[in-house]
A protein has these predicted regions:
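Terminal, low-structured helical/coil segments at or just beyond the last alpha-helical repeat
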Residues: 29-34, 44-51, 174-221
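Alpha-helical segment of the N-proximal tetratricopeptide repeat
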Residues: 53-93
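Helix-start (N-cap) detector for alpha-helical repeat units in TPR-like alpha-solenoids
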Residues: 60, 94-95, 128-129, 162-163, ...
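Position-specific recognition of the canonical hydrophobic site in helix A of tetratricopeptide repeat
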Residues: 71, 98, 105, 136-139, ...
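Structural signature of tandem alpha-helical TPR/SEL1-like repeats
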Residues: 73-81, 106-119, 140-153, 176-188, ...
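Structural marker of alpha-solenoid helical repeat scaffolds
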Residues: 89, 123, 157, 191-192
Length: 221
């Protein structure tokens, strides 16, 4: 049952990786791991980057849009080449490094994933997509408290960044066994994205388990 939980995918969670080019900010019960696998499956959709300079050269925008289109189509080999060329010519856009991190994570290349995320966060320490991807990397490598810190920073700088709330729910329930915190962040995710039937089931499950724990604690007192 636990293995089943680690493989189910939430389409709404995966869909939160928005392809906005330069503008804006930028996988026992139900499986919470699906958001953590977004970069390996449905996932791979490119993220947007925050502007590092006020003017976007037209040629840079064209290159970025072409790279994100190739990545969204699932051709990670071509997308990686395009983003590598992009960051050589235009090294000041953190979103491009985040997309490289997603590609490297898809290829299970953790060192390159970390290098790309470090580059993105050096440009913008508060970049929510970079922080979220860093949390995923840290979680995969068993660094749960560091992952928590990365996710929490993402939702602090961008409270409406639903995917980081989702990943906090995953982390708190499956790895840190903090059910009330997991419930809080799944509810925040659901409030932001709307009708996700799978997450609705998870919330019901967690609500029941939290209530049972509270009853047990009351009896013990």
């Amino acid at each position: 049952m636990f293995l089943q939980r680690l493989t189910r995918t939430s389409p709404l969670a995966a869909g939160l990786l928005l392809m906005l080019a330069f503008a804006g900010c930028s996988g026992s019960g139900p499986v919470r791991e699906s958001a953590e696998t977004q970069q390996r499956s449905a996932a791979g959709e490119p993220v947007d980057g925050e502007l590092a300079v006020p003017v976007i050269p037209a040629e840079a925008l064209t290159m970025y849009e072409q790279a994100t289109a190739v990545m969204a189509a699932g051709d990670f080999v071509d997308a990686e080449l395009r983003f590598k060329e992009f960051v050589l010519l235009y090294p000041d856009y953190p979103g491009a490094f985040v997309n490289l991190a997603i590609i490297n994570a898809n290829n299970e290349n953790d060192p390159e994933t970390r290098a790309a995320l470090d580059a993105a966060l050096a440009l913008d320490p508060d970049h929510p997509a970079a922080l979220n991807q860093m949390g995923m990397l840290l979680r995969r490598n068993g660094n749960f408290l560091e992952a928590e810190a990365a996710y929490l920073k993402a939702v602090t700088v961008s409270p409406d960044y639903a995917l980081a709330h989702y990943n906090l729910g995953v982390l708190y329930e499956l790895y840190l066994q903090r059910l009330e915190a997991a419930l809080q962040h799944f509810e925040a995710y659901q409030a932001l994205v709307g009708d996700d039937k799978q997450v609705e089931k998870w919330i019901s499950d967690l609500t029941r388990r939290v209530a049972a724990n509270q009853r047990t604690a009351n009896v013990a007192e």
